[in-house]
């Protein structure tokens, strides 16, 4: 049996799986081949259960394809493989990390071998502010395809802060659950280590604190405070844009925390490299750990969010009513919850049962606005959901037909249904030139005449966006 068996499996899995999935679940595994058994060691029970549930068949299939009837049996363990091994027994991973998920920079200082999580002291500063909202936990975060990887990564960070995913960078549109996950991580860490110094903040508070420190000649105290935390959770990092002094100070804070194995989690409304006005050295560091997108929730997740929110308020929400609301409000979780709060308030005030007709009346102005309001953002979300791809794919440089055709469709719809100019549409699709938009519109127009499927897709999307 080849000693490179696990390396062969890794190479195939890296080709077959999305880069984020491979980096998150497969890369942390260690392997040992002995007595026709391939033992896979996971860093914790969460990773072990996930790999066994999601990838067991993939791995067994690869072992069979490589070894036939002599394929080894799989065994899963939590921990690390034994240190004392012969060279013939050790099997390790040598697959290069995907650049877009984890980037190792030559100038990065080597992490300290001493973990700051071995002996977490009680907070020393009387002005220490956690700001973690105890109401936001993993238990009340509704999981769906759109946020599954982000939740899983956040859960691992909460279980093993300062470990593999440092920094963790979550990005996506407004109201999709990024802030909820930040607080959930903070609560998870403090549940394990009650004395851990976990600080949640909006990026503008970091800027404000630094300005006050400069005004009061207290910059050294500022540095000590932020570099002594065990986990720093910063929301909306894009607001650092064009704030050069703040970026300079955060650059050094970032390096100090990483060297001390202190956890950093950042969120933004866009991919790190697409944040304008932020220094390249910072954007590069943002991608050192794991970068995960949160997409707008799909229909099933929107329904689940409404049902869970209603349950938390001891309100019986009929399934058909949840579906009615979810089908019409597609943009984000915050909008859904706001609509449901209005429905609940109206029901409490009037004493009426919650039916579709009641919801239609209670949300009359909101639904009327949704029916009239067709934006490029809405078109992108609708097209992505229709073709079962991500909004990020529409904005990417990918040219495969499975992405390029929906992108052309979305551009044509934007020209048809909005008042935006071709350059404005191009800019909304990843900064593309207006000639690209014009070509897309002409291509879809041609295909609508030649292909019944394209004609039907266009009609269905027009109907969905206009209804």
Curated annotation (Swiss-Prot):
Instruction: Kindly give the Pfam families that the UniProt entry links to this protein.
Output: Bac_DnaA, Bac_DnaA_C, DnaA_N
Compositional bias per record (Low complexity), positions renumbered to this chain: 98-111
Give any GO molecular function from the UniProt entry: ATP hydrolysis activity
Region of interest: Domain III, AAA+ region: 131-347
Query: What SUPFAM superfamilies is this protein classified in?
Result: P-loop containing nucleoside triphosphate hydrolases, TrpR-like
Where does this protein hold ATP? 175, 177-179
Q: Which pairs of Cys residues are joined through disulfide bonds in the record?
A: none
For this record, the Gene Ontology CC terms, alphabetical, are: cytoplasm; plasma membrane
The UniProt keywords, alphabetically, are: ATP-binding, Cytoplasm, DNA replication, DNA-binding, Lipid-binding, Nucleotide-binding
Q: Where is this region: Domain I, interacts with DnaA modulators?
A: 1-90
Q: What SMART domains does the record point to?
A: AAA (SM00382), Bac_DnaA_C (SM00760)
Matching entries from PANTHER family are given as: CHROMOSOMAL REPLICATION INITIATOR PROTEIN DNAA
Instruction: Please give the family membership noted in the entry.
Output: Belongs to the DnaA family.
Free-text comment on this protein's domains from its UniProt entry: Domain I is involved in oligomerization and binding regulators, domain II is flexibile and of varying length in different bacteria, domain III forms the AAA+ region, while domain IV binds dsDNA.
**The name this protein goes by in its record:** Chromosomal replication initiator protein DnaA
Q: What is the lineage of its organism?
A: Bacteria, Pseudomonadati, Pseudomonadota, Gammaproteobacteria, Enterobacterales
Q: Which gene encodes it?
A: dnaA
